[in-house]
Design a protein with these regions (language model features):
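Feature captures the catalytic ectodomains and active-site-proximal regions of enzymes
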Residues: 1-164
Length: 164
């Protein structure tokens, strides 16, 4: 999440949106827990609420062209492609590149508290988490494991997929 000099690669998206479209866009970072020494409350995924009258497509296209952004989804697209609950996300959902993070404004993120290199959560590059199960899987779950199991599938695999 840092450049070659070790400095954080941060897109302060709410600041950039205000500069381009005026005040009123609100960026929410789901990773806003108080333990900030690794991630500075910056994330690889944010949701954006747009004020009335703003052209959603124009904003989405503009965000998509920013260095460090890999995906911009409308609420409907995020629901369908990312399985996100539509009542808990904004008008747009934005994902960053492997070595980038997204935040609101510099004032919302105190990077002086970082103790080491910047880490993050929530993006495509953090979703590949290995399953380690101490027993062999039955044939049905062994076949499922060759697909694209998600982190929350581990409970199903452990409870129902172990060979008897």
């Amino acid at each position: 999440k840092c450049n070659a000099a070790g400095e954080p690669n941060v897109i302060f998206l709410e600041t950039e949106l205000a500069r381009e479209f005026g005040e009123g866009c609100r960026v929410i970072c789901p990773i806003t827990d108080p333990y900030v020494v690794h991630h500075g409350a910056l994330g690889s995924a944010v949701t954006v609420y747009l004020p009335d009258g703003v052209d959603e497509r124009a904003v989405a296209d503009w965000i998509a062209a920013l260095d460090g952004v890999t995906e911009v989804h409308t609420r409907e697209s995020a629901m369908a492609k990312l399985e996100l609950p539509g009542d808990r996300i904004g008008d747009l959902f934005v994902l960053s590149a492997r070595d980038w993070v997204i935040g609101r404004t510099p004032e919302h993120h105190d990077l002086s508290k970082l103790e080491d290199t910047l880490r993050s959560h929530g993006g495509r590059y953090e979703e590949m988490v290995p399953f380690l199960i101490s027993e062999p899987l039955n044939s049905r779950y062994a076949a499922l494991a060759k697909g694209d199991p998600r982190n929350f599938d581990i409970f199903d695999f452990v409870c129902n997929g172990i060979q008897s």
